Design a protein with these regions (language model features):
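Short, flexible loop motifs at catalytic/binding sites
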Residues: 1-212
Length: 212
């Protein structure tokens, strides 16, 4: 049975022009850091609190020519929040598939929980991402569907998790901890970037780690 109001809403949403705000400006306008995240600075996100993150987000914006952004900063800095901001901007402004790799299953589970909290806190994301109990779309620990795309959050330790997933945007957390050769099939970074071959003109990659 087709739910006509829902189909109509999706059609109208697809016809709206992209906002096309740079990631940092989108974040200042829409991103909310949930209290449940444990952050001491929860509430409305403000780039001014971490001004050194602004240039990174500018580079991740669609209209910036940079294709690959690499960051190495101290622990508990802006790395993952910037990736969350980029993901949120993707869902709201220019939806497409987003591949977000973690080095271990434990970190992937933690990231998925953080993504869920962010989606719940941000109105423009909550109304676009599938609900966990949705019958029409998927929202699991590793896969979260939204209007116009899907977020994939596998670990980097299995080549099978990287195969046959086209993705315009790729983020790799703690890239230095990823295995250098996944199931004897190659570097996980190269395997992930192979998923971007159909998006050569507008792909983006964000690799981040912390200083030891």
């Amino acid at each position: 049975m087709i739910c006509y109001p829902k189909v109509y809403d999706v059609l109208i949403e697809s016809l709206r022009p992209d906002l096309n705000l740079p990631v940092d400006e989108w974040s200042d306008r829409f991103m909310i850091i949930p209290k449940s995240s444990g952050s001491s600075e929860y509430g409305q996100y403000k780039t001014s609190r971490t001004p050194h993150a602004r240039e990174v987000m500018k580079c991740l914006s669609d209209d910036h020519p940079c294709k690959r952004v690499i960051c190495m900063v101290s622990s508990q800095q802006f790395k993952t929040q910037v990736a969350l901001n980029w993901f949120g901007s993707t869902v709201h402004q220019s939806p497409s598939n987003f591949l977000w790799l973690m080095p271990t299953g434990a970190l992937a589970k933690r990231l998925s929980a953080r993504v869920d909290k962010t989606i719940k806190a941000v109105d423009v994301l909550r109304e676009r991402v599938a609900k966990p109990n949705s019958r029409d779309a998927k929202n699991t620990q590793e896969v979260k569907e939204y209007i116009g795309g899907t977020l994939f959050m596998p670990t980097a330790g299995s080549a099978a998790n990287l195969a046959e997933v086209p993705a315009r945007r790729v983020a790799i957390d703690e890239v230095d901890r990823c295995e250098s050769n996944v199931d004897n099939e190659g570097d996980p970074i190269k395997l992930a970037e192979a998923r971007q071959t159909t998006f050569s003109h507008n792909k983006k990659s964000y690799y981040y780690s912390f200083i030891q």
